[in-house]
Regions:
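Terminal, contiguous helix-loop blocks that mediate binding/assembly
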Residues: 1-199
C-alpha cells in the first residue's frame, strides 16, 4: 500500500493495516500537492523484481532536488515486523501517564494533528520505567527492523525536522475529547495502552 496523501506514516495507521499488505509506504508529514512522481516511481514498481525502496528514494530525491518545493518525509514499513514493535512498545507503556509534548518533534501544522515522532514520544513517555535501557533497546531494534527505508529533509515548510524515526504518533492524553474517543477505537490504542485512566 502506498499512501500518497498527508500524515499517513503514523504507527496507528500502519498498525491498523498490518494484516493487509507486506509493505507500507507513507509520509509522516504532509506531502506537497504533486504527490508521488509516478513517472519516476512506476519503473521501480512495475519491473519483475519490484524495488519499493528505490521507488521511495526516487520520490524523496524528486522533492529534495526541487528548487522551490524541496520538502519531503517518507518511509517504507515492513508490516510483518509491526507486531514485534507493538510488543516492545507495550512493555514500555505499561505504566504510561500522559506527558508534556512541547519539546517533541512535531510533524503537523495548523489544526492538523498534532502528530509527533513515534520513537521520541515513546522514549519520553517511558524513560522513567524500570529497566528502561534494556526495554528501549529492544524497542529500537524492533522499530529498525520494521522501517526498511526512511528519509527526510531538514525542514518541511515552516517545520524544522531534527529527527524522524520514520513514523509519527498521536499523544494520548486521556482527556475525553472527541479525538481521543475516536483514538480509543483503534487497534494500536487497545493493544498498547493501559485503559484504567480513561475519562
Amino acid at each position: 500500500i502506498w499512501m500518497d496523501c498527508c500524515y499517513m506514516a503514523s504507527i496507528e495507521c500502519a498498525y491498523e493495516l498490518r494484516n493487509k499488505c507486506q509493505w507500507y509506504i507513507a509520509y509522516p508529514t504532509e506531502i506537497l500537492s504533486n504527490g508521488m512522481p509516478y513517472n519516476l516511481t512506476l519503473p521501480y514498481l512495475t519491473k519483475d523484481n519490484i524495488d519499493i525502496v528505490g521507488a521511495a528514494d526516487a520520490t524523496f530525491n524528486y522533492f529534495n532536488d526541487s528548487y522551490d518545493s524541496n520538502y519531503c518525509t517518507i518511509s517504507v514499513v515492513d508490516m510483518s515486523q509491526l507486531n514485534r514493535v507493538a510488543e516492545a512498545t507495550k512493555v514500555l507503556m505499561s505504566t504510561f501517564k500522559p506527558i508534556d509534548t512541547k519539546d517533541l518533534q512535531k510533524f503537523s501544522r495548523g489544526s492538523q494533528g498534532p502528530y509527533y515522532d513515534f520513537a521520541q514520544y515513546v522514549y519520553q513517555a517511558s524513560v522513567n520505567t524500570d529497566n528502561f535501557s534494556e526495554k528501549y533497546a529492544n524497542f529500537t531494534s524492533a522499530l529498525n527492523n520494521a522501517i526498511v527505508y526512511k528519509n527526510y529533509t531538514a525542514k518541511f515548510l515552516n517545520l524544522k525536522i531534527n529527527q524522524c524515526s520514520g513514523l509519527s504518533t498521536h499523544a494520548v492524553m486521556y482527556d475525553g475529547s472527541d479525538n481521543e474517543k475516536y483514538y480509543y477505537t483503534l487497534d494500536w490504542f487497545n493493544d498498547i495502552y493501559p485503559k484504567l485512566e480513561q475519562n
